[in-house]
């Protein structure tokens, strides 16, 4: 007696005995001996990931099958991967990933990217941000996106070092193997209020004073390269200036200068 199996056009059948895979059957009807019948593992060629145990076996004992039927996603410590199906980004693979995927003709592709080049490719950034029905792209947390509006600039720091300013627009950066920080800065004229300052005049009169100062950045890059938080620094400087201006004068002198 014989056993018949049917393999669809989008499938493979892997035959094994005692856990050893020895033959691949393609689409069609196949007849297997009833006695000592091999085990049959039906594989759907849908771009899915090959389970780790099977992937390790194929790498060791059937490398020709890996080359013919699988997409190999072995990434170095400085590589990320963009996995596409039919031109649609499915997943961002992290460095040191080691996976196999079942091929779907030429519809499954992997784009390798060097994460030492911190800016992310524009096409990958756009694909990550594109709205989709099935949720967000898996692995997108490896990418930092920065939106800088009009009349603003972005301050980019990589591993603690301030880089060139970012113009208005959208950019993205790898958070892998680097500490990437950004801050969006308004370059327009702004108002900073120093409220409720209680200060003694030179003649010991207690005054409660509010101060409003108009200001804007003259050199954003210089400010952020020298100061961690420029606005906090400006606030303290205004406090000191106010205390010096009031504390070194009598009340009458202040009223005269008013």
Where is each model-derived feature located?
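N-terminal hydrophobic membrane-entry segments
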Residues: 1-258
């Amino acid at each position: 007696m014989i056993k018949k199996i049917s393999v669809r056009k989008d499938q493979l059948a892997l035959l094994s005995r005692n856990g050893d895979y020895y033959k691949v059957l393609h689409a069609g009807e196949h007849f297997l001996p009833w006695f000592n019948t091999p085990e049959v593992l039906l594989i759907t060629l849908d771009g899915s990931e090959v389970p780790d145990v099977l992937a390790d076996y194929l790498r060791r004992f059937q490398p020709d099958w890996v080359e013919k039927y699988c997409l190999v996603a072995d990434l170095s410590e400085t590589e990320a991967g963009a996995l596409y199906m039919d031109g649609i980004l499915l997943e961002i693979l992290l460095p040191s990933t080691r996976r196999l995927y079942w091929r779907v003709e030429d519809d499954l592709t992997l784009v390798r990217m060097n994460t030492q080049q911190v800016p992310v490719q524009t096409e990958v950034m756009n694909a990550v941000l594109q709205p989709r029905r099935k949720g967000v792209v898996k692995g997108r947390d490896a990418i930092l996106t920065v939106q800088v509006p009009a009349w603003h600039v972005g301050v980019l720091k990589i591993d603690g070092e301030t880089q060139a300013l970012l113009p208005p627009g959208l950019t993205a950066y790898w958070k892998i193997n680097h500490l990437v920080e950004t801050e969006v800065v308004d370059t327009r004229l702004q108002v900073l209020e120093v409220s409720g300052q209680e200060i003694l005049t030179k003649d010991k009169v207690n005054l409660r004073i509010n101060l409003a100062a108009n200001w804007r950045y003259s050199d954003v890059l210089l400010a952020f390269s020298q100061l961690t938080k420029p606005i906090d620094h400006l606030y303290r400087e205004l406090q000191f200036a106010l205390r010096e201006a009031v504390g070194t004068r009598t009340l009458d002198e202040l009223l005269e200068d008013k």
